[in-house]
Regions:
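Metalloprotease/metallohydrolase-associated module, dominated by Zn2+-dependent proteases
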Residues: 2-61, 78-147
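Active-site recognition of the HExxH zinc-binding catalytic motif
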Residues: 65-77
Length: 147
């Protein structure tokens, strides 16, 4: 099947304006190999460059939702890195500390749920009528009922 690159580029351009990210250089890269994610974003804060990775066979059915989600990670990157650094200052850089693992897990859960809530709200406020993607939840349902 594959994703439509020009549609994705239009969505990135549209949402760069809405999210006030016009000062960033954002490149789109389609991931052709098997990949567990629908999307990701790699960020160079010093140079204000980012590469948005989109799975050519995404689990997400709403590409606009996927683009907004990844761009919000870019928008929140500074705060994300500050909080990760804070957790590392408290618990150290080493692995295996259950308190640090707990703090990091809670932080990432809160970050993802916040990004998801902001994504849904922004899509609705900007008139996106396409149904939200239930890809991750659908996978759980399929494994539960044997589809």
């Amino acid at each position: 099947m594959g994703v439509n690159v020009s549609t994705l580029e239009e969505l990135i351009n549209k949402w760069q304006d809405i999210l006030r990210l016009r000062d960033w250089d954002i490149k789109l890269k389609i991931v052709e190999t098997e990949w567990r994610k629908s999307g990701d974003i790699k960020i160079d804060m010093d140079d204000k460059k980012a590469v948005m990775l989109i799975n050519n066979n995404p689990k997400s059915t709403n590409l606009e939702e996927l683009v907004v989600h990844e761009l919000l990670h870019l928008k929140l990157w500074g705060m994300d890195q500050m909080l990760e650094g804070f957790i590392n200052q408290i618990f150290g850089e080493g692995e295996g500390d259950i308190k640090k693992e707990f703090a990091m897990n809670q932080f990432f859960i809160l970050l993802e749920s916040t990004v998801e809530d902001l994504t849904k709200g922004l899509l609705k406020a900007n008139g996106c009528e396409k149904e939200l993607s239930f890809g991750r939840l659908q996978k759980l349902i399929d494994s539960e009922i044997g589809c």
